[in-house]
């Protein structure tokens, strides 16, 4: 069992090495839009999971997730060799690639928040012209305040303790 801090440092280094190799050394066109977002290494330092995202060629085009996964699987051996040569550890971790779903979840949450904001704006527009169904203050009785203040003056004037 290795130190968790060492596993984190190793994961960061593996992420950097693999990202650099994908960008500059591996010439597979399926990996052109692949970005390594995170890496996790098990505490025994034998397995590394690399999380990746894929960018589409344009904003309207859906990314090719299957092609990127196939390209990463094909390049896995070369990438592991590069990681082993760069790290200088006794055992080079096996590499596994997993698609990072955080950006997709973030887009879905942004869409839900935009929908909620639009609903709030619609409700605010409806409220601006709205009036209460009944009177402005249905519990207020006109004239009741005058009677209550008159009763208080009468009670204050006749104090039987002073006599």
UniProtKB/Swiss-Prot annotation:
InterPro entries (alphabetical): KH_dom-like_a/b, RbfA, RbfA_dom_sf, Ribosome-bd_factorA_CS
Assembly and oligomerization: Monomer. Binds 30S ribosomal subunits, but not 50S ribosomal subunits or 70S ribosomes.
Pfam family for this entry, one: RBFA
Record carries keyword Cytoplasm: yes
Record's keyword annotation contains Metal-binding: no
Location of region: Disordered: 124-163
Paired cysteines (S-S): none
Species whose genome carries this gene: Mycolicibacterium vanbaalenii (strain DSM 7251 / JCM 13017 / BCRC 16820 / KCTC 9966 / NRRL B-24157 / PYR-1)
Protein name: Ribosome-binding factor A
Keywords: Cytoplasm, Ribosome biogenesis
GO molecular function: ribosomal small subunit binding
Record field: compositional bias (Acidic residues): 144-163
Entries under HAMAP family matching the protein: RbfA
GO biological process: maturation of SSU-rRNA
């Amino acid at each position: 069992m290795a130190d968790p801090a060492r596993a984190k440092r190793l994961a960061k280094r593996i992420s950097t090495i693999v990202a650099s190799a994908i960008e500059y050394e591996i010439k597979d066109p399926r990996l052109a839009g692949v970005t390594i977002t995170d890496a996790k290494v098990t505490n025994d330092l034998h397995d590394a999971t690399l999380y990746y995202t894929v960018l589409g060629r344009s904003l309207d085009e859906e990314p090719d997730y299957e092609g990127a996964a196939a390209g990463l699987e094909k390049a896995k051996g070369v990438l592991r060799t590069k990681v082993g040569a760069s790290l200088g550890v006794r055992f080079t971790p096996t590499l596994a690639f997993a698609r990072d779903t955080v950006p997709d979840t973030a887009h879905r949450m942004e869409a839900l928040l935009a929908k909620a904001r639009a609903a709030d704006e619609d409700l605010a527009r409806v409220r601006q012209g709205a009036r209460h169904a009944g009177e402005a203050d249905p519990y207020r009785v006109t004239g009741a305040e005058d009677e209550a203040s008159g009763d208080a003056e009468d009670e204050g004037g006749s104090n039987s303790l002073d006599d």
